[in-house]
Amino acid sequence: MTSVELTRALNERGNDTKFIATGQTGILIEGDGIPLDCVKADFVSGAAERMVLEHQHHEILMIEGQGSLVHPSYSGVTLSLLHGCHPHGLILCYEIGRHKVTGIDHLAIPPLAEILKLNESLASISFPCSVIGISVNSRRATPAEADAERDRLRDEFGLPVADVFRDGPGELVDAILQLQQQRLKD
């Protein structure tokens, strides 16, 4: 949902932004896209790249993420999506209080710093890419807990951090626009 909210907010600020749906729910929301988990593994990167090329006339492409690089069941799709879309920047999504990989109770989620580095490393295979913000899912946290965790993440990573539903997407939108401006200068 982060990418949907960011797309909406970017368009409201006058940017020509396209949400690229990569899963069934995203397709229902957007009306188009490709359900990457239904594509044969060898072709997922190409399917992602095709969507980027089809919509490259937009100023900003907001590509829906899939799974997690640290989830053994879904990391193949996640990695293929990263390699196929060649992102310029990433918004890392994180849920407060989730300590185990969903559906694999014996597998702990690594520290967020490790996940961030892993995403940046694997997204930078073809072109440089970095995490430019963190989207926090604080649905299981009290407002005070969410505020404290957001502040902790800002201090630890020096990045914009927001729960797009609790805080609004503004801080993350600013990070995207800053990256866009920097890329236009380069």
Q: Which residue stretches match the model-derived regions?
A:
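Flexible phosphate-sensing "switch/lid" loops adjacent to ATP/NTP-binding sites
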Residues: M1-D186
